[in-house]
From Swiss-Prot:
Enzyme class: hydrolase
Enzyme nomenclature, EC number: 3.2.2.27
GO MF entry, a single one: uracil DNA N-glycosylase activity
Record-annotated membrane-spanning stretches: none
GO CC terms of this entry: host cell nucleus
Residues making up the signal peptide according to the UniProt record: none
Protein name: Uracil-DNA glycosylase
Function: Excises uracil residues from the DNA which can arise as a result of misincorporation of dUMP residues by DNA polymerase or deamination of cytosines. Therefore may reduce deleterious uracil incorporation into the viral genome, particularly in terminally differentiated cells which lack DNA repair enzymes.
PANTHER family per UniProt: URACIL-DNA GLYCOSYLASE (PTHR11264:SF0)
Keywords: DNA damage, DNA repair, Host nucleus, Hydrolase
Residue segments, region Disordered: 1-20
Amino acid sequence: MFSASTTPEQPLGLSGDATPPLPTSVPLDWAAFRRAFLIDDAWRPLLEPELANPLTARLLAEYDRRCQTEEVLPPREDVFSWTRYCTPDDVRVVIIGQDPYHHPGQAHGLAFSVRADVPVPPSLRNVLAAVKNCYPDARMSGRGCLEKWARDGVLLLNTTLTVKRGAAASHSKLGWDRFVGGVVQRLAARRPGLVFMLWGAHAQNAIRPDPRQHYVLKFSHPSPLSKVPFGTCQHFLAANRYLETRDIMPIDWSV
């Protein structure tokens, strides 16, 4: 597949429990890994195979070391929050980002999304403008929290899941990209007919779904620095038209 709804079960330890330790032995133990990051168990078939790879143990060891020496974003309980909004079998659209926002209070585990109480970043503002261009009647709250999309089956996934506060791309060499690539590859094999939105060269090089099996949409990155204005992107409309041809419920892109 690659060259590179039901309500999910409530994850363990979400109500103020002491932070569980990271697993260290190889192969990594699924139960310990799940507890450490509050991962929904529905994602086990897609994530657990990565735990047998020694590179994942090395990744977690380096992540743990960074947590001891620098402020890492998002908080550990949000690194895998994308597993808690919908199950793999409910995913309809995959939007690939690069790494989390690096200012405090913004990142919460969903690519491009920010917490509801913080200003909308410029790239996300352009994404929402493109939605409005596709759907002029869409209700937009003025906030940048995309949890509603995630619950509707939009997987908002960064290729790098963590970042040092104030230092963009600072964790890009930890190995998250390999881990995430494996997860997406298994999702694509399990779920033919997904819509992939790949914005910018990074996403398009990192994730390469088979266009014979999936609907692959490419555009420039929504950054204000991109040469092509993202407001002209028609991906949200195109995705829904494709889903409708497969008798799948379209996404309500309102925020």
